[in-house]
Each structure stands twice: as C-alpha cells, then as structure tokens.
C-alpha cells in the first residue's frame, strides 16, 4: 500500500490508554503519547489507485505506524 499525496480530514479517534493496542505500541516502537487517527487518502494498491479511509497510529518522534485501509470510497 502506498499513500499518494496528503491525507485530508484527519481526526483523532483515541489517545493514550484509550487505544486497545497501547501496550503493544510501546513495546514494539517505544514512545508514550500514542494517538490513533483516521483520514481520507488516495491509495495505490496492486497498481490500482483509489480513495480510501485509512487508520493509523502516530507518536511524536516516531511518526505514523500500522497504516491500514478501513473502507474504499
């Protein structure tokens, strides 16, 4: 999966201990202030380009991790 361009309408879904995978994120990537976010992006997957709702986790100093497509638009 490759994100083409910017992610628009990004919003926070959960932060800190409100994230189900919070302990896993700290163990695997480090950091403390994790945020789960969602937004709309143009995604290229298997040579097909389409708009999709994507979800990801991010932390200051680490960046975006575990990005996944939740819904094709």
Regions from the PLM with identified roles:
Residues 1-73:
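Cysteine-centric segments in proteins
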């Amino acid at each position: 999966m490759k994100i083409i361009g910017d992610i628009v309408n990004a919003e926070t879904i959960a932060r800190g201990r409100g994230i189900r995978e919070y302990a896993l994120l700290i163990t695997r990537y480090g950091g403390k202030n994790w945020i789960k976010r969602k937004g709309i992006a143009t995604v290229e997957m298997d040579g097909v380009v389409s708009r999709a709702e994507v979800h990801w986790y991010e932390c200051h100093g680490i960046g975006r991790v575990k990005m996944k497509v939740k819904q094709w638009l």
